[in-house]
Amino acid sequence: MAEANWGIDNDYATLRHVLLGKPEHYRWVDAGPLTKRTLQNAHKTGVKFDLQTAMAQHTEMVRIYEEAGVTCHYLRSDDVLHRNFFARDSSCMTPWGALICHMQLKCRRADYVTAIEFYQSNNIPIWKMVTAGHFEGGDLVILKPGHALVGYCGERSEQEGSEQVAAWIKEKGWDVEVVPIPALFVHLDGLLVPIEENLAVTCLDALEPWVIDWLTARGYDFIDVSFKEAKGLGVNLVPLGGKRILSMKGSDGLNAKLREHGYEVYDPDMSMFTLGGGGVHCLCQALDRDPA
């Protein structure tokens, strides 16, 4: 295993180590707007959960990481913590170590247990633990060194939790804003993911105009995602570095735009997960990226 420099100062440079989970106990439950839409419309759409299909899709995602040279680490699976494999939310990596989050969903409130276990057993420093209101890792977007956005929708991360996290990052001298988002998108990484130093994938129709202005003033251009693809978690991709993107099947418009911009795009079928509340970005936590 390659030696790691734990921590990230961006979310787009070459990914070296990633934290995942094992969806051995996965099932669809009402876990917010995304899964609720799936369950409420299933009698018309005909979609059904299948664990074997989910496991096969997850295995294909892992194969892509490994073939890209990424070392994969895993949270311990647990039959009670049956959604802890969505590794984005129970913690998040920063330049200063791991941030342990305070999750709102009842079925995920104890996910911090396996997150803390992982960091302690691998001698990865824990920087902070959220205490002021709920905060989930998908709402921290590290844009580039010195710049970050912290989101909240209220149903998952709350304003108090997001403001606590933002204050800690500001103490490090970073330029940070707290961003309210529509609950439909659950977390900010469902609306905005940086893929280069000054380029982000986003759904401009769903971001507040002042957020777009804030980003533009800091040099950002955008690859815009349609509202239809964004509500299906199209934005929720993972930059692997070196003009490589882990996206998903179904994000046809976005994937075409990425290829037009010169990116190599991997687009596995992750439908058991997107219908169940999370895309490939939700399923991972970057532990070590090259410095920007």
Positions of predicted regions on the chain:
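The feature marks the mature, well-folded catalytic cores of soluble enzymes
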Residues: 1-292
